[in-house]
Amino acid sequence: MNLFRKWVFFSFFLVLVPIANAQSPVFAGVAPSMEAGIGYSYLNVDVPSQTRIAMNGVDATFSINFQRRFGIKFDLGYDRAFNVFDTNYHADLLTYMAGPVFYPIRRRKFSVYTQLLLGGARQTGVNFDASGATSTGWVNRLAWAAGGGVQYRLTSSFSVRLGADYMRTWFFNSNNAIEGQNNVRSAVSLVYTFGERREHD
């Protein structure tokens, strides 16, 4: 079972457990809702044995909010950089993660959220070996992200979301050994909400 299949299994598990618990009475004003978002992402990537590089791309999310303060989020991101270290090679990072999202502040017009996502990341890129020669390759390993942000409602269905995360991924260093990366991601997204939520200030 490869990493992607494990992520799919984990994602279904995250959905099924809250649904099973949802058989208890639902209180007025906390009806479940779903959100789909897509937007621009900026990723500052730590390349082992080298300096950091900037990637730009797209981030797509799907959230199921089972309660007023709690939900599950699925996150799929793709970011890319061109002519990395002036080598004419590109680098990209594909992430696929899921996990819980919490809303410490949730109002009719805006909300504040925190999240912890777990899944995988496949990075393709370039590095230099000990002799200074160019080395290219890819790594697909476990990844996780932790962060938060704010979401402002424009209409009853559309919102704007601003978020930032610390992201942990992996890539090879100058000795061709796999090493952890400390990355920072920020994103701005347009979000569409399915279902009504009667929030009060």
Predicted regions and their residues:
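Membrane-spanning beta-strand positions in outer-membrane beta-barrel proteins
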Residues: 35, 71, 109-111, 149, ...
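Bacterial N-terminal signal peptides
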Residues: 8-18
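Extracellular loop and loop/strand-boundary signature of outer-membrane beta-barrel proteins
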Residues: 45-48, 83-88, 130-136, 172-178
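Short glycine/proline- and aromatic-enriched beta-strand/turn motifs that initiate or cap beta-hairpins
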Residues: 22-66, 72, 185-201
